[in-house]
Amino acid sequence: MLTVTVAQDGSGDFASIAEAVLAVPYEEEALVQVGPGIYREKLVCEKRCITLRGVGADKTKLVWGDGGKLPHKDGRPTHTFRSYTAFFSGETLCVEDMTIENDAGPGAKAGQAVAAYVDSTRAVFRRVKLLGSQDTLFCAPLPEKEREKDGFLGPRSLAPRKPTAQYYTDCEIAGDIDFIFGGGDALFENCVIRTVDNRIPHSYVTAPSGKADGLGFVFWNCDFVSDCPAGSVYLGRPWRPEGKTAVLDCRLGAHIAPEGFIAWNDRTDTGLASFAEADSTGPGAAERPAWVKQLSGPEAAELLAHARTLCRPKIN
């Protein structure tokens, strides 16, 4: 395995993460060890098999500040999928012990502002903080069709929609509107899901857009926390009609709305969506509408086993 080091003080092979990643041949398995510091960079990482490893989420920070409403260098608005702080693609990705942040600010000012755009076929995030406001984490692929002109403008707008399997463990993910979204299959274990209070009437944690035969987003043993007003945050809404989110054995703060989930904007097409819950606890746990499925113990165990088989890395 190729190992390269990044240090802002000049003691490593490179002084920036982008330079280190660029130096890695696509086909070579590589470890990029990133020292402490705030790396203000917009990162594109497209490698066959690469690990980015910091020295702790509070010590190694990758930060950028593009927002969907802000102007792009081509004269058009940046839009959602060009706003990323880090874009990841390739076959296998591992990110550990660092923060990836989009600090463009609240959506009212900056628009959608992606911290991590994860397009790798298989991706693992361990002890990572993903911080932003609107649209913090995009779990690719995109839906088949955009609803607005230039809505998918970005690195994969014209590419075939390929499935991805993503695993997040011991991470913190923060944002306010649809801050975990996309069509990927993703398992979140032992994570803190923090809704940021940006003084908006309602916030939404997930916006899944996957297909009916996919896994969607599964959360197990996670803490949903926030300083937002009680009952003002929804666990999810379907970005596309067949979107799926399941919340298993999680602790829900008082900010979670009693309904748990809601339709997309003024749409009422919740019939195809799959929102499910099992053994939620905390002040945000409540009786849900009939279209939110309450899983039995065996059903929840079967779903979790399937999610782990699909998303957990084969080799740690």
Over which residues does each language-model region extend?
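Sequence-level preference for short, compositionally simple segments enriched
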Residues: L2-N316
